[in-house]
Amino acid sequence: VSRDGWDAGTRWSVFDAGPHGIGHQHNDKLHISIFAHGRDLLTDAGKFTYRGINDRSPRDWRGYFKRSWSHNVILVNHKSQNDEINVATEPLTDWKITDLYDFALGTFDKGWDEHEGRHQRAFFNIKDKFWLICDRMELQESSNIQALWHFHPECTVSKTQDEHVFTTDIGKGNIRIAPVIMDSSGWTVGVVKGQTDPYYQGWYSAKTNRKEPNPCAVYEAADVKTAQFAWLITTDKGEPPVYKAEIVYSEGENLKVRIVDNQ
């Protein structure tokens, strides 16, 4: 958990980078939730139900809510993360908490169904300013990937021509997600809500056996084998600030992002 403070209007976020666990777990490694300016903005979808015919399918309610399709993670060829059965034997070491920023690094390497690979995600919370999320994908074979961002049902979500997605609720806390990609020509983004065909997407459950539609931004890129990209996330009560961000260096596991305040 990363937070800027303890008052009612503070920003706080959750980065799920720990071991998967041995029971009651969801396939949500590297998921991020964000609360800011008095309300939930990016969310975990909840659990909805313990009943299902095939909990490995996004056409099954149990499968959708339990597995990666309902979390803020990356899919490979629309497939969920595989199970990662393990127990922590030592503390996580790749994290740092300071007065100016919080940092954590997590890795998922158990594959997505039959697709082998590795997703590494670095989480930075520059306190009272923005979040920078850096992703590195290393896949066994070229695949389509889908980066998901689920919003709380009360959020009204729009997108811009340069593929930013943002909420537009007057007088409330709002959020903007800006992709930081060296070559964005191969990416598309759509916002879905309450989808049932060809599979479930854009559903949220605050309580068991209750569900409702919620917006989900789906960023998709084709023919990805090894790639690095980032997300700049800002919040504010009203209109979130806009920063200019660009990748200035990407080599191996190294990624350098330049961020400039447009205001």
Positions of PLM-derived features:
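Carbohydrate-active enzyme catalytic cores, enriched for enzymes
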Residues: V1-L41, D99, A222-Q228, V248-N262
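Catalytic Cys-His active-site segments of thiol-dependent hydrolases/isopeptidases
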Residues: L42-K47
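CBM-like, beta-strand-rich accessory domains located in the C-terminal region of large
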Residues: I53-Q263
